[in-house]
Amino acid sequence: MQDELFETEKAPQKNAKNAKNAPKKSFEEHVHSLERVIDRLNDPNLSLKDGMDLYKTAMQELFLAQKLLENAYSEYEKLQTPNKKA
């Protein structure tokens, strides 16, 4: 369970079957993916369509990274409160 706390499934795929079988990514992997996308978004020769696709990808990575942070914070709070079940 502890490992699951810090990993999410990769960003949703168009095909739902692929999303279920996708390997999990860590918070750091989501942040790294987000950084790569931001670098690509800074390309002045990027088309509008490609920019929008990259923006969607960035938002998915950000959402998943935020979920991991929320999960970690929730677990932290449970550990700080000994009266509650962890």
Swiss-Prot record:
Keywords: Cytoplasm, Exonuclease, Hydrolase, Nuclease. Its EC number is 3.1.11.6. Residues 1-26 are annotated as: Disordered. Gene3D superfamilies: Exonuclease VII, small subunit. One of its GO terms (molecular function) is exodeoxyribonuclease VII activity. It catalyses: Exonucleolytic cleavage in either 5'- to 3'- or 3'- to 5'-direction to yield nucleoside 5'-phosphates. It is found in: Cytoplasm. The keyword Cytoplasm applies. Heterooligomer composed of large and small subunits. This is Exodeoxyribonuclease 7 small subunit. It comes from Helicobacter pylori (strain J99 / ATCC 700824). The gene is xseB.
